[in-house]
Regions:
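Conserved pre-catalytic core of RNA-dependent polymerases
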Residues: 1-83, 87
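Mobile genetic element proteins and their domesticated derivatives, centered on retroelements
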Residues: 13, 30, 43, 54, ...
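Short, conserved micro-motifs composed of acidic
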Residues: 58, 142-177
Length: 281
């Protein structure tokens, strides 16, 4: 982008990724990495011993075992899933089709089941998608095209003449805003993030707390709740995403409006004095 180029991004959504992970496919990948036999047998025993059932109203079905799927909240689940789809990452890196930074391939960025493809051209992005989809099909996984999206960043971000499609012909739309790992990337001539959704979530969190304790709790308690429950929502991602002066002023206004409500004032100077008094800096 800094060299007047345009970067093409595709955020892929995998359909029920953790639920579709094949146990035997995972065991093969673990054996390829030559993990200890005892550990492999332990994992196999865990998966074989796991039982599930279906509840409908007050009725329960018979328990049955599953040949695929892992718990999304499990401690080991993210690591096992990362190992399971590692072949997708390696295939893209070896192709050298995507973008590179100092000769290091960054054509694919993966965190758990959130996949981001990055390419210098639309044609290259289509090739990356085809490579990923072929490998994912081999892993018995599929892409949810309706929840996936493409985005362009750079001088030609408004110019898009070619649609990105999956192997079976489903179109992945070009959008002005793409959500990845909780952050909203915006189509622009420079790398930009939107904090509009963060501000909405902050207001929801603050109003939920203030409506419960605003009339009975002290300012110290409300401010502590604001620090713990609301500020992390508002400031999520600001340490890694670029924040311009306009966005910074907008975030400051959101916080100031909440503090005005807590201290029951419309004066910014009073809010500043109260923040210093309560060490809220």
């Amino acid at each position: 982008v800094s060299c007047n180029s345009t970067v093409n991004i595709c955020a892929l959504d995998l359909s029920k990724a953790f639920d579709k992970m094949n146990h035997y496919g995972l065991f093969i990948k673990l054996m390829d990495r030559q993990i200890p036999v005892q550990l492999l047998q332990l994992l196999e025993f865990w998966f074989r011993s796991g039982l599930t059932c279906v509840k409908w109203g007050d009725c329960f079905s018979a328990f049955y075992s599953q040949a695929r799927g892992i718990r999304q909240g499990g401690v080991l689940s993210p690591y096992l899933f990362a190992l399971y789809i590692d072949s997708v990452i390696e295939k893209v890196r070896r192709s050298r089709v995507g973008c590179e930074i100092k000769l290091e391939s960054v054509g694919i960025i993966v965190y758990a089941d959130d996949i981001l493809l990055v390419a210098p051209t639309v044609t290259a992005l289509q090739l990356l998608l085809k490579m990923c989809e072929n490998e994912l099909n081999w892993l018995a996984m599929s892409i949810n095209a309706s929840k996936s999206a493409c985005l362009r960043i750079g001088k030609d971000y408004k110019t898009v003449s070619v649609c990105i499609r999956t192997i079976d012909g489903r179109e992945i739309p070009w959008q002005d805003n793409v959500r990845y790992l909780g952050m909203h990337l915006v189509a622009n001539n420079v790398f930009t993030c939107s904090f509009d959704n963060a501000k909405k979530s902050y207001y929801r969190a603050f109003n939920a707390i203030y409506s419960k304790i605003g009339g009975i709790a002290s300012e110290e308690v409300i401010l502590e709740m604001l620090k713990m429950k609301c500020l992390p929502v508002l400031l999520y991602g600001t340490d890694v995403c670029p924040v311009n002066k306009k966005q910074l002023k907008s975030l400051e206004y959101v916080l100031t409006s909440s503090l005005m409500k807590i201290f029951r004032t419309q004066s910014g100077d009073v809010v500043d004095d109260c923040m210093k008094f309560f060490w809220f800096v």
